[in-house]
Amino acid sequence: MNNITIVTAFYDIGRENWIYYNRDTSYYFECFERLCQLKNKIIIFSQIKFKPQFDKIISEKKSNLVVIYEEIFETNRDLLEKIKKSQENLQNMGGLCNDGKPPEYWCPEYILVNYLKSYFCLSAIEQISDIDDMVSWIDFGYVKKQKQIPESKIWRYDFDDKIHLWNILDIPKQLNILDTIKNNTVYIQG
């Protein structure tokens, strides 16, 4: 079984100020510190404003943590504007699930971070010379409970050498894309 390098990212999308689905930055760092218990290599993309928090994690918990500081909101202003316009179009059409409260419908920064997950993985592969043969994305705030960390402190799985996505719903033969977007239906994750 191959070793797996974990890639993740954390960017301030203002979530602590959201009316719905709000969480503060400290919550995410608590989750990430649990992830850092793993012996796997971890590469994180983030903003320079979080350098003190990452420096503390490196000095106290995970000395081999690799942090790549990249200001994605600055370098992707045009894309953020396009996302914002698309979200406004959806809102104007109406009929969004949960009255349009999910961030997919109104937070362009949320969409951008999710959109860039494959970019972060590829960028880690290109930039880090001692990366493992297998790379996996795990969300920065995924490890909410200690029981999610294996006793061995090593996350392994016998993947073959392909990109893996998980179907969480069967995809129908005929799919109305607009309805899927309006209902925020997720068929694939990975």
How should these model regions be labeled?
Residues M1-Y27:
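N-proximal low-complexity "stem/linker" segments adjacent to membrane-targeting elements
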Residues Y20-F32, S118, I149-I154:
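Well-ordered, non-membrane alpha-helical segments in soluble/globular domains
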Residues T25-K41, K56-I57:
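Short, acidic, metal-binding catalytic loop of nucleotide-sugar glycosyltransferases
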Residues I43-Q47:
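Short internal beta-strands
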Residues E60-S129:
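Active-site-proximal specificity loops/subdomain of glycosyltransferases
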Residues E109-W166:
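GT-A fold catalytic core of metal-dependent nucleotide-sugar glycosyltransferases
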Residues H164-I177:
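Short beta-strand-to-loop element that shapes/binds the nucleotide-sugar donor at the catalytic cleft/hinge
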Residues T180-G190:
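A recurrent flexible, glycine/aromatic-enriched loop bordering the glycosyltransferase active site
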